[in-house]
């Protein structure tokens, strides 16, 4: 089960702040909650330290019949998502559609989706001096995982994200807005890195010359998916774009997936990025900031389990061209994250939250080592996928 760091915010706070938060920070969520259309009176607010981007809180209220209601309150990071209207439009369209069509492996009914709770005046979010806030439904009796605790779990993760991909065919891609331009355009990310190297704003380039050289030796990889999209060789689809294992909620009793969360990056893209991102995280034998790079490798057993689940769910909707690019998907997205972490380190750690100096560099080195291992194992990855294609009757040849 994922370990959350939770800070309790008192409803009647003392004069001194706790847990390093200022009084203003502690009072902020409490003052925001009253603007949303929810049941009961607030009895508890807890800050959930999870994720790199938004600030998240668990809100508990008590109704007149002594029933406890739970919600998720988030302050949206407007540096990452400057167009909040577009973000929330995508969120509503996606969740409303999924609420009628998505059936998860661990659910007996369609529509187990994190829904928006509007403000009292009917808006999708609240904008005030402290930022942009939204309220969402909360799931009880579930847990999430940062890494798979068994091959079977990763198989079910593949099933879940594959079902999401297949169901989202029903959403008109032209109605989904691009809230982060070039989010998974690896070639564009590389050009951004070169720009950061040229500017060297905090004088860190000299310490990362080996990493820069490794990235530059892989430029032929970066455009494999984005160029296929741009040329129309593969279709643009509505994708999740953040298929981390911890964006799946598992039932505490059955241990099956019951919901997919974090729809902020749902945008026009390619399922190759979604598939590759899941593999990047789930097959890594080390943590994402592991200093001992000898521990970093791609677990091919886990790779096969996820591939089986994913293709079982949505392989029949993927084109021959998509299937033939699938072996490269994990390599492309792993290189992309290595680039992004390296760029943030060079820029002075302005995007990702860090817990210690140099963490973004550790993250980058881990991704680049994982890329190196995936590259060496590419022949085995091809064999795994071809075996699954043949078993499932998918028309593609990757050998």
What annotation goes with each model-predicted range?
Residues 336-399:
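ATP/Mg2+ or Mg2+-diphosphate-binding catalytic cores
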Residues 52-55, 60-62, 69-71, 76-191, ...:
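Conserved ATP-binding subdomain of kinase catalytic cores across diverse folds
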Residues 23-43:
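Juxta-kinase regulatory segment immediately upstream of eukaryotic protein kinase catalytic domains
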Residues 46, 50, 75, 82-85, ...:
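ATP-dependent phospho-/nucleotidyl transfer catalytic cores
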Residues 137, 309-330:
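Hydrophobic alpha-helical bundle architecture
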Residues 7-22:
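Short, Lys/Arg-enriched N-terminal segments with co-localized hydrophobic residues
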Residues 247-277, 281-285:
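Catalytic activation segment of kinase domains across protein kinase-like and atypical kinase folds
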Residues 272-316, 332-351:
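Active-site activation/catalytic loop segments of kinase-like enzymes and analogous catalytic loops
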